[in-house]
Amino acid sequence: MSGFADYQIGIYFDALTGTQSPYPMDYATLERKAQAAMSPSLFSYVAGGAGDEATQDINVTAFSKWGLIPRMLVGAEPRDMTVELFGETLASPLFMAPVGVIGLCTQDAHGDIATAKVSAETGVPMVASILMEDPMEEVVPYAGDTPNYFQLYTPKDRDLAASLVQRAEVAGYKGIVVTLDTWVPGWRPRDLSTGNFPQIRGKVLANYRTDPVFQQMIEGDESRVVMEWVSTFGNPLTWDDLPWLRSLTKLPLILKGICHPEDARRALDGGADAIYCSNHGGRQANGGVPAIEHLPGVVEAADGAPVLFDSGVRSGADVIKALALGATAVGIGRPYVYGLALGGVAGAVHVIRSLLAEADLIMAVDGYPSLADLSIEALVRLDGSHS
């Protein structure tokens, strides 16, 4: 049983002895305080999105178009938030989505390791970005028994792709998440206005620097790392590449960026084990549809296969709504990044426990004892359109 709601009781009792949490309880304050703790360029990179950031913004506000219907006399105690994913039982449906500059977001510039420690402490899985400050093999042991997954931006060089995936398998990652929507960077005015692109400056490339195939490509010349990375990054994959991707690993294969039902069906028919519905948090393409609006159709097309979701999740209420719309697991990005920036491991743990406490309390108050009780029938559209 969850017990996540107990986090709020602890906060109240701590206050009786004059101890107040140093970390914010709401997202807006968290973001504002994290901005003060981060360099302007790093905050801009994390906070920014594509174009005028309209899609990024509506990813967030779209959740307010759905409302959860309270059910009374249910006796929602205890509550069960466990979820089965790839043969593992997880204490909650929350996970930390991949963030390519997470390594830079702690004061010691070892944010990937810090995130793995958060994973161990909370039981919330981390999807580790390929873009790390520390090599993947040095990161995953810090996650302890919590399953972590490895995210791949598929390089043009197939031998390099195979090497990266094999390393992830050997290191102990439990699944491979292939991001499909970032074979070319989106138009991001915040970053363009300052020429801010961390990889071009040689940051977060530890997994390339430590790869034997990549070392062969640069012939051991470290001065070639950035240009070689630029030349091999970004493989415009097609459906014809899916059998090859499937052949790279026996681990669960999760395809990230799927927003159309037909794409979900083709992905699963082609050997994917799960769908990851996401529009990259609005960072890649402007002028789109809020990711949460795609979720019901993708879930229906997945026909029982796991569907992971992220984009715009800022609260426990958002988590509950995504679960009711059919997500198997729900990812957060900027919230835990800001927690790390503000307080390292402790800051991110606070963010995660706060989200889970709010979600647990909503299930209690509104009468939903388990995740199985949450469905699209538990929601109404507040904007007058049909669900």
Feature annotation, model-predicted:
Residues 1-87, 195-237, 372-374, 380-387:
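An N-cap/entry alpha-helix motif that binds or orients negatively charged groups
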Residues 48, 104-105, 128-131, 150-153, ...:
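Glycine- and other small-residue-rich loops at beta-strand/loop junctions that grip anionic moieties
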Residues 59, 291-301, 340-361:
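C-terminal helical cap(s) of enzyme catalytic domains, especially alpha/beta-barrels
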Residues 67, 73, 82-84, 93-97, ...:
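Short, conserved beta-strand segments within well-ordered enzyme catalytic domains
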Residues 90-134:
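Glycine-rich active-site/cofactor-binding loop and its immediate structural neighborhood
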Residues 111, 121-142, 146-161:
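A gly/proline- and charged-residue-enriched helix-loop-helix capping module
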Residues 116-117, 121, 142, 156-309, ...:
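Alpha/beta enzyme core
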Residues 367:
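Active-site-adjacent helical/loop segments in soluble small-molecule enzymes
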